[in-house]
């Protein structure tokens, strides 16, 4: 969705560079997950270091009040400080995903912003597009603001947008793979043809992947494994914060044209010795 405003007459101060998802506006374009950390302390420290404002939580795998006998993640990630984004990780059909979103809304006191993901199989965790479309329609009709994990197919992205999804979240590569952005061309097509925010979801492995996503014009990047599986998750969270910031600034600045041949940087006239 991002518009390149990289002109001298229309500067965009980065500190005012917000983006809107549904009815909410955010400053940080880095979204983070809560899984795979060694304990709650590390979870809180890494998320704090990331400066993320949106934190996604797998409702089927994380206790946010369902079980009073287990530690509650919300004691570490307070809804007063962060926007909690419930997700439907682990759902393989529309019905289960819909039910999970309704449970999240109940647990979070009417919260209606959700991340929909309906998976195709356990080996690839690739999105099941047909079930995703089915679930998205029901959830939108029920008043949810749906951010949707999907394939990098521009036509599917257009369909999800036309249904009313508030953000399109194509995968960069397989969930947890760390392979980076495999198909930048189709991601660019989605960005160019989508009016709602586009956020890369899945596949980011290191800071350069996040920067590239932002340089392409993505509105944000969501990640979990890249931070949680790093040797030093807190340091990696800081690196990702800076990478997303730098990539966004580079996009707004506008990169130089790519050329096949060399172009001298120094003047071609006025040499001291001729």
UniProtKB/Swiss-Prot annotation:
The enzyme's E.C. designation: 2.8.1.10
Keyword line: Cytoplasm, Schiff base, Thiamine biosynthesis, Transferase
Pathway recorded for this protein: Cofactor biosynthesis; thiamine diphosphate biosynthesis
KW Secreted (keyword) present: no
Predominant place of localization: cytoplasm
Pfam annotation, one family: ThiG
UniProt-listed CDD domains: ThiG (cd04728)
Highest taxon in the source lineage: Bacteria
UniProt-listed GO biological process terms: thiamine diphosphate biosynthetic process
GO molecular function: thiazole synthase activity
Keyword Transferase among UniProt keywords: yes
Assigned GO CC terms: cytoplasm
Active site location: 115 (schiff-base intermediate with dxp)
Role, per record: Catalyzes the rearrangement of 1-deoxy-D-xylulose 5-phosphate (DXP) to produce the thiazole phosphate moiety of thiamine. Sulfur is provided by the thiocarboxylate moiety of the carrier protein ThiS. In vitro, sulfur can be provided by H(2)S.
HAMAP family the UniProt entry points to: ThiG
PANTHER family linked: THIAZOLE SYNTHASE (PTHR34266:SF2)
Family that this chain belongs to: Belongs to the ThiG family.
Name assigned to this protein: Thiazole synthase
Gene that encodes the chain: thiG
